[in-house]
Amino acid sequence: MSEHHSGFVAIIGRPNVGKSTFMNRILGEKIAIMSPKAQTTRNKINGIYTTPDAQIVFVDTPGIHKPKNELDTYMDKAALSTLNQVDAILFMVEADEEKGPGDGYIMRQLAEVKKPVYLIINKIDLVKPDDLLPLIESYQHDYAFAQVFPISATMGNNVDELLTALTDALPVGPQYYPEDQLTDHPEYFVVGELIREKILELTRDEVPHAVAVQVERMKDREGGKLQIEAYIIVERDSQKGIIIGRGGQMLKQIGIRARHDIENLLGDKVNLKLWVRVQKNWRDNNAYLKSLGYNTKDLR
């Protein structure tokens, strides 16, 4: 019988390089929300990949960027604090983007960490193969990566090869979670993230960064349905108006789309009730951030 390998692997990179898409591809389920808008992921999200020979806990981190408010500071600290707590690190970049200052900043942070770092070049389906080598060389000039994997998280190219390499590199260890468990986050957290994803998909650019979702209640099933009640938090009355929409149509569409994904995730029929609440400047209010589950003091 072969030895069982297990460990924790951080996925790090600039906003919007495809970290959440990659993790959802591996798990075969949507537990990390996805959007073309930056700053989609706000918390560290653990995804659990299990085979007979290994268990890899992937930590999908917020995209690292220059902070503009207390929430941004929390997200950067959440991402960087992960680096010393894992067995390996995946540094993800985009095949169709040149190396930028943000990538250089991340590599300088990685230089302080004594863990193997894998360069993951995502979105190779968007470029010609001949364009990859110069990009790889530009990154290797700045950092000694353990290995380089060009992949497509959307199409699945080279993802299996990466998983094999990670399995071989991780230490011999136990299975930390049951084989059918995909995340260690509670259901209400994932439900809130799925609601927020639909807001990102449907609303204008000025709204998404100012939105949070607070799941107030997930009641026992009544009449065969799970009762979920949640508040959508915004900073201004004008944003509340956008979320609700004319005649409540936008809020209705958010609810319909979110309910569909929540039902797929939980395997139950859902009755979803949504309200919109204005909390001015909540992204700079440490007490309110803490009530939503963000606490920068925990990351010092």
Swiss-Prot record:
Residues 151-153 are annotated as: G5. Residues 203-280 form the KH type-2 domain. GO terms for molecular function: GTP binding; GTPase activity; ribosomal small subunit binding; small ribosomal subunit rRNA binding. One of its GO terms (biological process) is ribosomal small subunit assembly. The keyword Transmembrane helix does not apply. It is a peripheral membrane protein. Residues 60-63 are annotated as: G3. GO terms for cellular component: cytosol; plasma membrane. Residues 13-20 are annotated as: G1. Signal peptide: none annotated. Residues 5-172 form the Era-type G domain. CDD domains: Era, KH-II_Era. It is found in: Cytoplasm; Cell membrane. GTP binds at residues 13-20, 60-64, 122-125. PROSITE patterns: G_ERA, KH_TYPE_2. The keyword Cytoplasm applies. It comes from the Bacteria. Keywords: Cell membrane, Cytoplasm, GTP-binding, Membrane, Nucleotide-binding, Ribosome biogenesis, RNA-binding, rRNA-binding. Residues 122-125 are annotated as: G4. Residues 39-43 are annotated as: G2. Belongs to the TRAFAC class TrmE-Era-EngA-EngB-Septin-like GTPase superfamily. Era GTPase family. An essential GTPase that binds both GDP and GTP, with rapid nucleotide exchange. Plays a role in 16S rRNA processing and 30S ribosomal subunit biogenesis and possibly also in cell cycle regulation and energy metabolism. HAMAP family: GTPase_Era. Monomer. NCBIfam families: era (TIGR00436), PRK00089.1 (NF000908), small_GTP (TIGR00231). This is GTPase Era. The lineage of its organism: Bacteria, Bacillati, Bacillota, Bacilli, Lactobacillales. The gene is era.
